[in-house]
Amino acid sequence: MRTSQYLFSTLKETPAEASIVSHQLMLRAGMIRPLASGLYTWLPTGLRVLNKVEKIIREEMDKSGALEVKMAVTQPAELWQESGRWEEYGPELLRFKDRGERDFVIGPTNEEVITDLVRRELSSYKQLPLNLYHIQTKFRDEVRPRFGVMRSREFVMKDAYSFHTTHECLQKTYDVMYETYSNIFNRLGLDFRAVQADTGSIGGSASHEFQVLAQSGEDDVVFSTESDFAANIELAEAVALGERGAATEELRVVDTPNAKTIAELVEQFNQPIEKTVKTLVVHATEESGHKLVALLVRGDHELNEIKAEKVDIVASPLQFATDEEIRAVVGAGTGSLGPINLPMPIVIDRTVANMDNFSAGANQDGKHYFGINWERDLPVPHIADLRNVVEGDPSPDGKGVLQIKRGIEVGHIFQLGTKYSAAMNATVQGEDGRPQTMIMGCYGIGVTRVIAAAIEQHHDERGIIWPDNIAPFKVAIVPMNMHKSESVQQFAEELYRTLTAQGVEVIFDDRKERPGVMFADMELIGVPHMIVIGEKNLEKGEIEYKYRRSGEKEMIAKDQLLDVLKAKFAS
């Protein structure tokens, strides 16, 4: 491709509306242009990358045995009403009426459509398992679209849905999809972790997120230094720290009128934060017979709300008690709560159960207990894993310690179960001749988000550094002062024809521009291999080669250039 025949729309300045690197570079590299809030037009450079990502996804999905379909973007409301999500789904669901006053939605996801398709097409267990996928533009009416294509209203996703008659069969497909996703992200050149994840509102029995490690990520990814353990921080198991020692301090009440937070208690009384406990009060379930329940974590630890919701006595969704609700039961405010004589059920974190000689509120305003010890001063309450892990914690599998990095979720797989198939009566005839509700798995990849994540992970101060497999072009030919040098033009044209004939994707910069501008543009759009042709070097029989990722330059004999390039492509 010649730049003179190409929409080469690079920008020198960073647009003010772009706050993260991927958004900035996608705009500057001429990959996308904004149309409206959260809506983008993909220009040729961006579309070349998008098509390559989709190609890799298709190849691996086809290899897994999944079958590609194409579902409608517009979906009838009846299906959403049948599944129960017409009422459940929030304002992100774009609803409209057609000219016949019938309700429709622009699909943000496809569980209803695929379940309806399969229940119409399949009748027997002999037709299962079946795994169908498609790649489609979707729409969610995000309240605050931001970060370019990272969180846009319109986006491209790969969705797959599998159907089974047994959980064992589902597990086999789930394992295949786990491996398939790993292959996809490896081929895309991404540094990622597959992490255990909460099933959330989608439900199901198992779930993994595929997280690309990047500082701009919105999620905390936890993984071991010495094993394959990896989990979203919401699900990462926190082991008990330390061992409970002897009760060496007397229990005493201390006036603490100006210590209403853990930080103030530590500062004013020279108390190690590891010897403090904070008490968080939340609503209890109706079945428990209590209004409130107290959750205790160490002073320097954070409550994990997902874990807390899984405690039997805790109401879901988690709701913290107000100061008024707490005072009505305890007679003291939130900054003075503790486990001794607390008139509500208590659940303590594993690490709190191992503490000794610690301090906590005395359930009187302006007073704290110091020197609290379990069993001597009060019985050990119910123990649960309540906290977020912290970097340096032992890995729960006993191998290594935990590291925490930011991650961008680009894929998610679920063992979905019968949530949709049961609601929509999607059955087949089982081996026993009776109707059997199909068991489902679902598997998603945010295709456009993958591109943004790749840029977040692969860039420098000069621009994008694409992994070779998804770069818009493989080679950039930069002829210096070509329009003033017949020898440079002749060699550049011949090289361009030869590489193009070999199937190499080449961007040939034939603009009448200064060399510095040409170099900057090719580095900005992230072409991996740059060939610089200069008149003086040609006279010496040499061509300059530059590798984008390392910045390494070398001179190559011009009669060996094609062989050297071939070797570099292979490596």
UniProtKB/Swiss-Prot annotation:
Entry's Gene Ontology molecular function annotations: aminoacyl-tRNA deacylase activity; ATP binding; proline-tRNA ligase activity
Signal peptide: none
Enzyme class, UniProt record, top EC level: ligase
Reaction catalyzed: tRNA(Pro) + L-proline + ATP = L-prolyl-tRNA(Pro) + AMP + diphosphate
Principal subcellular localization: cytoplasm
Subcellular location: Cytoplasm
Matches recorded under Pfam families: HGTP_anticodon, tRNA-synt_2b, tRNA_edit
UniProt keyword Cytoplasm, yes or no: yes
One CC-aspect GO term: cytosol
Keywords: Aminoacyl-tRNA synthetase, ATP-binding, Cytoplasm, Ligase, Nucleotide-binding, Protein biosynthesis
One Gene Ontology biological process: prolyl-tRNA aminoacylation
Annotated PROSITE patterns: AA_TRNA_LIGASE_II
Enzyme Commission designation: 6.1.1.15
Self-association state and partner proteins as the record states: Homodimer.
Family: Belongs to the class-II aminoacyl-tRNA synthetase family. ProS type 1 subfamily.
Entry comment, domain topic: Consists of three domains: the N-terminal catalytic domain, the editing domain and the C-terminal anticodon-binding domain.
Function: Catalyzes the attachment of proline to tRNA(Pro) in a two-step reaction: proline is first activated by ATP to form Pro-AMP and then transferred to the acceptor end of tRNA(Pro). As ProRS can inadvertently accommodate and process non-cognate amino acids such as alanine and cysteine, to avoid such errors it has two additional distinct editing activities against alanine. One activity is designated as 'pretransfer' editing and involves the tRNA(Pro)-independent hydrolysis of activated Ala-AMP.
Cross-referenced HAMAP family: Pro_tRNA_synth_type1 (MF_01569)
This protein's name: Proline--tRNA ligase
Organism: Pasteurella multocida (strain Pm70)
Name of the gene this protein is made from: proS
